[in-house]
């Protein structure tokens, strides 16, 4: 059993806590305490993100409740989410 971390209800990705192979089942806990499972369709490196729903090209990628990038292509639920399919939207820091 492989677990992942989903912090915020707005998240559309979860962070896996172990190496994931295509076909593995990954679980995450919902805010109400229930568990949801997702079938990995690509390998996912430990501590990387897995899509927990389909994300369309141009949609926001949300991790820990924060907008961390935009999908550079359509991403299917169960796919590895990383720099190969997400464009950064970093903003200049004002200090």
Name each model feature, range by range.
Residues 1-95:
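N-terminal small-residue-enriched
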């Amino acid at each position: 059993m492989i677990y992942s971390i989903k912090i915020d209800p707005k998240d559309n990705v979860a962070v896996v806590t172990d190496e994931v192979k295509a076909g593995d089942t990954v679980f995450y806990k919902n805010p109400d305490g229930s568990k949801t499972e997702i079938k990995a369709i690509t390998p996912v490196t430990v501590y990387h993100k897995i899509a927990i729903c389909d994300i369309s090209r141009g949609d926001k990628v949300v991790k820990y409740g924060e907008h961390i990038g935009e999908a550079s292509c359509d991403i299917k639920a169960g796919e590895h989410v990383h720099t190969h399919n997400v464009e950064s939207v970093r903003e200049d820091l004002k200090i």
